[in-house]
């Protein structure tokens, strides 16, 4: 079996979406009574499909996402045999401080075929040197993943998620709206809060307003701020929690290690915005901040 790996195109969106949707055993939605009910895929709205796993849950949102990738946001690859797509990989180049450095992060590796998986990984490894990346990384949730059984993985960082109270504090800071989405701004910056995959991938997902055409997403209160506190700059992304408007999901990019002053500024600003709880994912070595 000869497997070809190539850059994905818009024409591939249907097949890629099918790979992701095949992993969803039951399609559901919340009815007007607030109860979860099983529904056929075809009867769900684009947004209801989105809630099951993001952009690749439908061709419509997948095409929007693919267009963003092809314009330079990331690297989309497909593995095919005789023009039939068996696998998809999506990766992002990110330039961050140590221990990450300049890396190529795998955001998605979707295939049910081991040979296709290996072919996609080999194609990404071949891109490391031309892209001047020192390592290929992938995130896992919980304990060992299937990749631990197949490949030699070296842990770099462990992420912990915390609920932090938003509260007013005696801190002098400046917070202004910042809508510039040029990724060059965070080149070499750390992402001490909200880094689930890589700084670049999170930026392309959160800072770019590519999903405003979905009214349900547009209605969620979202803020992008440039914060200056005690001589340190930070870029803050804050989004209302899906089911609790008094909770917020937070992501922060900084040119230097995270400081107590920046955290205090974020908590104070969030409290003034009406939030009472901040959901923050941080490296376990930095949680004392």
Where are the predicted features?
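Extreme N-terminal starter segment of soluble prokaryotic enzymes
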Residues: 2-5
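Conserved acetyl-CoA-binding loop-helix of GNAT-fold acetyltransferases
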Residues: 111-128, 150, 256-271
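Amide-forming acyltransferase catalytic core, primarily the GNAT-like/NAT-type
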Residues: 14-20, 24-83, 151-244
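Conserved active-site alpha-helix within GNAT-family acetyltransferase domains
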Residues: 142-158, 284-289
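Extended, charged low-complexity segments
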Residues: 242-289
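A short, internal acetyl-CoA/4′-phosphopantetheine-binding micro-motif in the GNAT/acyltransferase core
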Residues: 80, 92-97, 103-117, 247-260
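Conserved GNAT-family N-acetyltransferase fold
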Residues: 77, 87-89, 104, 109, ...
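Conserved GNAT acetyl-CoA-binding A-motif
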Residues: 128-141, 272-283
């Amino acid at each position: 079996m000869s497997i070809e790996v190539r850059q994905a195109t818009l024409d591939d969106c249907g097949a890629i979406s099918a790979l992701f949707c095949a992993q969803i055993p039951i399609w559901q939605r919340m009815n007007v009574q607030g109860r979860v009910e099983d529904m056929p895929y075809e009867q769900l709205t684009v947004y209801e499909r989105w809630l099951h796993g993001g952009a690749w849950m439908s061709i419509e949102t997948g095409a929007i996402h693919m267009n963003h990738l092809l314009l330079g946001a990331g690297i989309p690859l497909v593995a095919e045999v005789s023009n039939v797509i068996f696998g998809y990989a999506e990766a992002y180049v990110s330039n961050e401080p140590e221990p990450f450095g300049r890396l190529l992060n795998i955001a998605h590796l979707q295939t049910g075929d081991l040979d296709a998986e290996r072919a996609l990984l080999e194609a990404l490894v071949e891109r490391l040197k031309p892209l001047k990346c020192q390592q290929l990384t992938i995130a896992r949730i919980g304990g060992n993943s299937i990749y631990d059984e197949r490949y030699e993985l070296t842990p770099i960082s462990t992420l912990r998620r915390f609920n932090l109270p938003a509260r007013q504090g005696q801190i002098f800071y400046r917070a202004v709206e910042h809508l510039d989405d040029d990724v060059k701004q965070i080149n070499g910056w750390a992402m001490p809060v909200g880094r689930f995959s890589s700084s670049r991938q999170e930026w392309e997902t959160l800072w770019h307003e590519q999903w405003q055409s979905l009214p349900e997403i547009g209605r969620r209160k979202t803020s992008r701020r440039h914060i200056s506190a005690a001589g340190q700059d930070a870029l803050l992304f804050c989004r209302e929690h899906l089911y609790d408007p008094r909770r917020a999901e937070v992501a922060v990019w900084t040119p230097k290690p995270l400081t107590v002053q920046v955290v205090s500024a974020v908590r104070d600003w969030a409290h003034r915005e009406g939030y009472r709880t901040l959901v923050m994912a941080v490296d376990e070595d930095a949680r004392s901040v």
